[in-house]
Regions:
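Active-site residues of response regulator receiver
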Residues: 5, 50, 81
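Two-component/phosphorelay signaling modules centered on CheY-like receiver
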Residues: 8-27
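Alpha4 helix (beta4-alpha4-beta5 surface) of REC/receiver domains from two-component response regulators
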Residues: 15-16, 41, 60, 73, ...
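Acidic, metal-coordinating helix/loop segments flanking the phosphotransfer/catalytic sites
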Residues: 28-46
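Acidic catalytic/metal-coordinating carboxylates
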Residues: 30-31, 57-63, 135
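Short amphipathic alpha-helix used as the core "switch/output" element in two-component signaling
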Residues: 37, 59-72
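The feature encodes the CheY-like receiver
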Residues: 54-57, 81, 85, 103
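C-terminal output helix
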Residues: 104-114, 118, 122
Length: 149
């Protein structure tokens, strides 16, 4: 699991929640500009991403991650933010986020969402060899574009 948040206390909280659930293969960073390098070297099964960070926000990270994820792959990205407006949620989802949680976090809800995303990732990895890449790419092409609601 890769966690990116510019606030160290938020990273510490997420790491503690994950550790309590036995999830120890975690890499965290307060530097959103390093996300792609970490993603390429770590190959996470889940990315947990804060949206609003200085200099390089989570939306820019989402755009870059989307370009790196192959058509025959599925990487769940869980977005965390204090800005839970409809426009923010829709923009994040349109850019590839798979789920969205508002801050302050509820520990139980957060862990249930994380387990659901990890389960989906595991199922996808088990099935991706059965589905041609072209079919997945067609699904991605029909995804609505991000824009004003």
């Amino acid at each position: 699991i890769l966690i990116v948040d510019d606030q160290r206390p938020n990273l510490d909280l997420m790491e503690q929640l994950l550790a309590r659930e036995g999830l120890h293969n975690v890499l965290s960073s307060t530097e959103p500009l390093r996300t792609l390098d970490l993603f390429n070297s770590f190959e996470p099964d889940l990315v947990i991403l804060d949206l609003h960070m200085p200099a390089f926000d989570g939306f820019a990270v989402l755009e870059q991650l989307n370009r790196r994820i192959p058509a025959n792959d599925y990487l769940p990205i869980l977005v965390l933010t204090a800005d839970a407006t409809r426009d923010t949620r829709l923009r994040a989802l349109a850019l590839g986020a798979r789920d969205f949680i508002s801050k302050p976090l509820d520990a139980l809800e957060t862990m249930l969402r994380i387990w659901n995303l990890l389960e989906t990732r595991a199922l996808y990895k088990a099935l991706r060899e059965l589905i041609p890449s072209q079919q997945i790419e067609l699904l991605r092409q029909h995804r609505p574009a991000a824009g004003p609601a």
